[in-house]
Amino acid sequence: MLSEFFNNITSFFVNIFSLFEGKRNIRILMIGLDGAGKSTLLYKLKFGDVIRTIPTIGFNVEIIEYKNLSMNVWDIGGQNNIRALWRQYDQRTDVFIFVVDSTDRERFDEVKQEIKNIIEQNKNESSNASLLIFANKQDMLNPITPAELVNSLDLNSLTNKKWHVQPCSAVRGDGIYEGFDWIVSNSSGK
């Protein structure tokens, strides 16, 4: 109930400001397992710097202006006990961003299941929502390649969903803008 209130208030102000600027509004839900780098990525995009973060308990909301978009980005914590709450925030989502720690191969089955859950839960409500997967931590030792991640997560089976895997390093900023360029080209915002 409280999340719906915040959602409505935030959407109202985003819509008002964007009307004056001629930008399309989109709602983004940024999710992923704990420790994947969601908040680091969000704040690198927002402020251009690495901001020291602590594990997100609940959510962070930022409005990011990028090219012709005004993006209302909801960064939701990824701890196991918080993931059940993802469903509370996904109404009217235009783009799902799933951030993956591309060095943590032991959790790829868990990532695959969570992506499957999100898509299954949103068959009707956000069926046109695009899916951007950031393969984060590419600056670390031995990260998985995008092609390997596509195979590991069986993404080619998502035939009714626009999706893209973007390698990135949230700390260095590599690949972040390319991912958001994909969103500009593939989102159906208002």
UniProtKB/Swiss-Prot annotation:
Q: Which residues does the annotation say bind GTP?
A: 34-40, 75-79, 136-139
Indicate where this protein resides in the cell.
Answer: Golgi apparatus
What keywords are assigned to this protein?
A: ER-Golgi transport, Golgi apparatus, GTP-binding, Nucleotide-binding, Protein transport, Transport
UniProt gene name: arrF
Question: In which family does this protein belong, per the annotation?
Answer: Belongs to the small GTPase superfamily. Arf family.
The entry's protein name is ADP-ribosylation factor F
Q: What is the lineage of its organism?
A: Eukaryota, Amoebozoa, Evosea, Eumycetozoa, Dictyostelia
Protein task: GTP-binding protein that may be involved in protein trafficking. May modulate vesicle budding and uncoating within the Golgi apparatus.
Example GO biological process: vesicle-mediated transport
| One GO cellular component term | cytoplasm
The reply to whether Nucleotide-binding figures as a keyword in the UniProt entry is yes
Q: Name one Pfam family in it.
A: Arf
Sequence intervals crossing the membrane: none
Q: Which GO terms describe its molecular function?
A: GTP binding; GTPase activity
